[in-house]
From Swiss-Prot:
Protein name: Urease subunit beta
Keywords, sorted A to Z: Cytoplasm, Hydrolase
An individual GO BP term: urea catabolic process
Known pathway: Nitrogen metabolism; urea degradation; CO(2) and NH(3) from urea (urease route): step 1/1
Family annotation (InterPro entries): Urease_beta-like, Urease_betasu_sf, Urease_subunit
Annotated gene: ureB
Protein's cellular compartments: Cytoplasm
Domain of life: Bacteria
Organism lineage: Bacteria, Bacillati, Bacillota, Bacilli, Bacillales
Amino acid sequence: MIPGQYILAKEDIVCNGDKKVTKVKVLNQGDRPIQIGSHYHFYEVNEALKFDRSVVIGQHLNIPAGTAVRFEPGDEKTIELVPYSGEQKVYGFKNKVDGDIQSYTKRGR
């Protein structure tokens, strides 16, 4: 082994392979670019992004951690989302959910 050498696996690395993927068409109707990070709760993104929010509660972008998707004004893209893992609780962002995803869905938005 050489110091600093990378030894990589021969097979591809699969992220979120066991998660249900939701595809959503998104349109930026605003006049400014909007960038969404990999772990941002997509339900709570900028209101200038138009899409069916009811299908994205509890989900984030299906992209590598630390990356983002950028929507220029007028851009329309189909993106992939995956559900959060763990306890299915979301806190912060725009404080729309602030708790259990299932409870939020049941009590109505």
